[in-house]
Curated annotation (Swiss-Prot):
GO biological process: glutaminyl-tRNAGln biosynthesis via transamidation; regulation of translational fidelity; translation
Similarity-based family: Belongs to the GatC family.
InterPro entries in the cross-refs: Asp/Glu-ADT_sf_sub_c, GatC
Record's keyword annotation contains Protein biosynthesis: yes
Keywords recorded for this protein, A-Z: ATP-binding, Ligase, Nucleotide-binding, Protein biosynthesis
Gene Ontology molecular functions: asparaginyl-tRNA synthase (glutamine-hydrolyzing) activity; ATP binding; glutaminyl-tRNA synthase (glutamine-hydrolyzing) activity
EC number(s) per entry: 6.3.5.-
Protein name per UniProt: Aspartyl/glutamyl-tRNA(Asn/Gln) amidotransferase subunit C
Organism: Bordetella pertussis (strain Tohama I / ATCC BAA-589 / NCTC 13251)
Domain of life: Bacteria
Stretches assigned to coiled coil: none
């Protein structure tokens, strides 16, 4: 599957980025290269290959370094107000953000 110029223009519009004609051409070539690589990977026979959860897990024991799931600070109305003071807009104790998905 190859992307054409209209596909790249649509992707740029959805990503909300503006591309010059030269950038659009380079992006088209790079994206088509990535899609070609994906097609090659999909063609590889992986029958009988054990799945990996992590690429290094086949060579060493991987232990996740996670912190204890504990409250680190008591949530108070004063703390909430302090945090919301950093927001450009807030309502009902929540951060308001601009709509980014059509």
């Amino acid at each position: 599957m190859a992307l054409n110029e209209q596909d790249v223009a649509r992707i740029a519009r959805l990503a909300r980025i503006e591309l010059t004609p030269d950038q659009r051409g380079r992006a088209q070539a790079e994206l088509n290269g990535i899609l070609h690589l994906i097609e090659r990977l999909q063609a590889v026979d992986t029958q009988g290959v054990e799945p990996l959860a992590h690429p290094l897990s086949a060579h060493e024991d991987i232990t996740l370094r996670l912190r204890e799931d504990a409250v680190s600070e008591q949530a108070t109305e004063a703390r909430r107000a302090e945090l919301l003071a950093n927001a450009p807009e807030s309502a009902d104790g929540l951060f308001l953000v601009p709509k980014v998905i059509e």
